[in-house]
Amino acid sequence: MDKRFLLLIWLFLSSTAAIGQTSTGFAPSEGVDLYYETYGEGQPMVIINGGPGFNCKGFQGLAKRLAQQYRVILYDQRGTGRSVMEQIDSTRMTMGLMVADLEALRKHLGFQEWTVLGHSFGGILGNYYAAQHPASLKALIASASGGIDLTLLRSFDLTQRMTTAQRDSFQYWTAQASAGDTSAWADARRRAFMATAYVYDDAHAPRVAERLGQGNPQINQLIWQDLQRIGYSVQAAAGTFEKPVLVIQG
């Protein structure tokens, strides 16, 4: 067999192995052992998924793509997925502790600095982390982030992009849930219509609806309450942050 052909095969297999290389582990933090996964080699990049209250599984595909150039880290935020907590309450579920979790994970993995990519709520957490630990970041990426303060919440309308039929159906099933209908069918219908708010192509809505069913509503509520309690705003810190920042929206 041609030696050049063998070399090409070896190079292909080596690059494929590097991209697909995955390791898992647990990083101790305050009151929780954080489950994490790493992909690829290179400069470290941590992905903070949205929510709050969701595990990191929905971002494994993105992690594998980015692993072609970076060492990508996913982690289950406290109380989600495999980052199990014995008790969840307002003292154990705060933005301050979630920032401490990120620092604990960075130190556990031995990185001096890393790129932080936060999506949706993950962008809010990424901003808050950057405000408190700017030296730990090489760069900050905010993907469809909630912003640098709570201004967005004053005008946010989840149903804005829904059709009239979708909006009516979502509001109907939401009312059913509020009235005490806890059946799996009612929950599935509510998620099915809610998912249409997050996509431009409704063909992708079923995948989003499935993902919405993986969330922990208690964690979601506690963190949003904590954001209100602390008066979340990183405007002052943003003015002095000197690392590269990429904002992705649309």
Predicted regions and their residues:
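Conserved hydrolase catalytic core segment
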Residues: 112-154
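Glycine-rich His-Gly loop
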Residues: 47-51, 120, 250
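Short beta-strand/loop motif that positions the catalytic acidic residue
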Residues: 241, 247-250
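Flexible "cap/lid" loop of the alpha/beta hydrolase fold
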Residues: 140-176, 217, 221
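Alpha/beta-hydrolase
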Residues: 171-236, 242-243
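Conserved HGGG/HGGXW glycine-rich cap/lid loop of the alpha/beta-hydrolase fold
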Residues: 29-85, 89
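Bacterial Sec-dependent N-terminal signal peptides
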Residues: 1-23
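Active-site loop/oxyanion-hole signature of alpha/beta-hydrolase fold enzymes
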Residues: 77-121
